[in-house]
Amino acid sequence: MKRSIGINIIFMLAALLMVTFAGVYYLTHQAKDFPFRCSAFSRYDLSRNDDKRIEFAVAQDLRFDQKDSGYLLLNGQATSNDGVTILNRRVALINGAKISDDTYQYQISKVVTSNTDTTPDVIFNKLLAEITLDPTHLQLDVDKIDKNTYIIGGPISYLYTCQRY
């Protein structure tokens, strides 16, 4: 009788120890979601034919500062039939939520145009339409592919690979 009680106590302590170690392992190996900062350089060719050339060469800096706010910096140049212009804008994000395991959705509160930006809004809006869900929301898939490397996907396709910093 005493022996079976001792064995039961040993099994209970072993099970408690295993659950404790599993919990500690789980908590220490979870990815830290916020803040999320990731940058990359991308080239977008949105030309529909040779007569209507629209290309962007931009550095993108995506920052989810907190669960409910962040921004996307777009710096570079836009090339159209009218020539080459400078693109320097910040897309401010609010009311964010993690809507699935790897998908974030934010409301676009405003697009801030720098004094150095010379790209017409009609050209910029074509790029914005390529990377956003609609003119008022940004929805991105953030898939980890390496220790600090992520692939960022938009509503239509993957957009770019970036390095988290």
Language-model segments: what does each one mean?
Residues S4-Y25:
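Hydrophobic membrane-insertion alpha-helices, especially the h-region
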Residues S47-I99:
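Extracytoplasmic/periplasmic/luminal assembly and interaction segments
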Residues K32-R53:
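Tryptophan-anchored aromatic micro-motifs
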Residues N95-Y165:
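Non-cytosolic head/periplasmic domains of membrane-anchored proteins
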Residues S39-L46, L73-T79, I108-T113:
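Generic short beta-strand segments
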Residues A22-F36:
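Aromatic-capped interface at the extracytoplasmic side
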Residues C38-S42, E55, R89-V91, I99-D101, ...:
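Extended beta-sheet lipid-handling architectures
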Residues D33-S39, K67-L73, T103-Q105, I145-I151:
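Short, hydrophobic/aromatic-rich segments at coil-to-beta transitions
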